[in-house]
Amino acid sequence: MTSLFFEYTFPLIIIALKVVAITVPLILCVAYLTYVERRVIGLMQLRRGPNVVGPFGLLQPIADAVKLLFKEPIIPTNSDRILFILAPMITFILSLIGWAVVPFAKGLVLADINVGVLYILAISSLSVYGIIIAGWASNSKYAFLGAIRSSAQMISYEVSMGLVIITVLLTTGTLNLSGIIEAQRTIPWWIDLMLLPMGVVFFISVLAETNRLPFDLPEAESELVAGYNVEYSSMGFALFFLGEYANMILVSAMTTTFFLGGYLPPFNISWLDCIPGFFWFAFKVGFLLFCFLWIRATLPRYRYDQLMRLGWKVLLPLTLFWVVLVSSVLMYTDHLPSV
């Protein structure tokens, strides 16, 4: 009986503890990212932001969570009740399970699988289903139009995002996210310089993927009231909200992993190795999240035709050309990784 416990039950307990250790801090980070966003945008607009609930407004996310938790969930009369309830759950769960393959530091990863890149792409592709189901189940033309916009936008920019990732795979030779980070220790500086434009394209693509400004067409308030979540209140709205911000942190972590060296120090200086890798990872992710907030505070919303033109007529040809360019240069200079 003891051997059965150690062989089957004990590993499951360890996995459950790891999941809790990732999920709980992530939800706290998501809650306080909303606070940081309101403070940063307030400063950029020369106002204070939240400053009443607790010292410096630090308890504002908790007050918001309590308010949403105790509000009455209202389900529209002619909606599909089951799908209406399931949609925000799907969106929130998918935003969490992507973290399973993210390496926070050397050896600090829940599932160090050899197809981590494919796993991330699969999760990002599935996230559109929660939004589509929410728009359709709400039985509202505004919600449905927002969901259609979101699906078209996410599918359009996933193409260029996938091609950008191919350029990274050409230089690193692995689908394992930890392997991609470790490969960046030895990549020549000129290859990093060649990947820099693709890093910018990837960041633009994930802005569209997460429906953030200047690409927040699915929830354009002036046109669609609130988009696909217009009929949601209480915890349904909260789960969509948490999912959006968890996805923001996830795509920032992916950008860090692919282009900024993940948990590696930014410079090859010996004393920087004394600082834990998790600190560097968190610092880089925090910088990218600040860029998200900066863009939201400064840039206007694109028109929908401009959004699609940018995705299909600018970013897609550019990434296709860059895949050919990178592969040709790597082959000519004999820097193609051995797989």
From Swiss-Prot:
Topology term for the membrane: Multi-pass membrane protein
Record's subcellular location: Cell inner membrane
HAMAP family in UniProt: NDH1_NuoH
Reaction(s) the record says it catalyses: a quinone + NADH + 5 H(+)(in) = a quinol + NAD(+) + 4 H(+)(out)
UniProt record similarity statement: Belongs to the complex I subunit 1 family.
Keywords: Cell inner membrane, Cell membrane, Membrane, NAD, Quinone, Translocase, Transmembrane, Transmembrane helix, Ubiquinone
Domain of life: Bacteria
Enzyme class, first EC level, given as a word: translocase
Keyword ATP-binding annotated: no
Protein name: NADH-quinone oxidoreductase subunit H
Keyword tRNA processing: no
UniProt-recorded Gene Ontology molecular function terms: NADH dehydrogenase activity; oxidoreductase activity, acting on NAD(P)H, quinone or similar compound as acceptor; quinone binding
Function: NDH-1 shuttles electrons from NADH, via FMN and iron-sulfur (Fe-S) centers, to quinones in the respiratory chain. The immediate electron acceptor for the enzyme in this species is believed to be ubiquinone. Couples the redox reaction to proton translocation (for every two electrons transferred, four hydrogen ions are translocated across the cytoplasmic membrane), and thus conserves the redox energy in a proton gradient. This subunit may bind ubiquinone.
Location (main, coarse): membrane
